[in-house]
């Protein structure tokens, strides 16, 4: 079973199943309708999508055929439900700690993130006690047998921390990289502040030139 050949929609589907298994276990496994809603929800998703039932069903069918998702047909219900077998089950080759599971889940539904972002967004999945705990889990995911499962990306402009990205989605299918809104806002503010600083310096230079011209009688 290959863990490195999932496309973007398949990754979003697995991430949502992992998330709901932890955060709303009483509603898990998920029906197709519930899974579509989970994939397209506005909060805790990057990018926000508008996947159709057909797109999600196609992804589910592909994942079921590869043993990464199981379809459950309960005798008392006409609606099929789905649960993942991606990790941490008796059928999974991939066994992750709770911290590692939270990180992979977050990356599957929100893309590349910094250690600080992973810690602040993981509350319902896993309670990281420190940034060091996040770093240790990331290091483990980089060195696990069969990995690396995450990789460190180049530093973004205007960003102090570097982001980590999962290594499961094929690069050709990955959405175009974009800076987070927080990063973009921060970088824009820095540029605006620099422009104002330069404008103030130019104004002072012009004033000084005028003073020198007046003093020389020009």
Swiss-Prot record:
Cross-referenced Gene3D superfamilies: Winged helix-like DNA-binding domain superfamily/Winged helix DNA-binding domain
InterPro entries membership: DUF480, WH-like_DNA-bd_sf, WH_DNA-bd_sf
SUPFAM superfamilies: Winged helix' DNA-binding domain
Protein family: Belongs to the UPF0502 family.
PANTHER family registered for this protein in UniProt: UPF0502 PROTEIN YCEH (PTHR38768:SF1)
Protein name per Swiss-Prot or TrEMBL: UPF0502 protein Mmwyl1_3509
Biological source species: Marinomonas sp. (strain MWYL1)
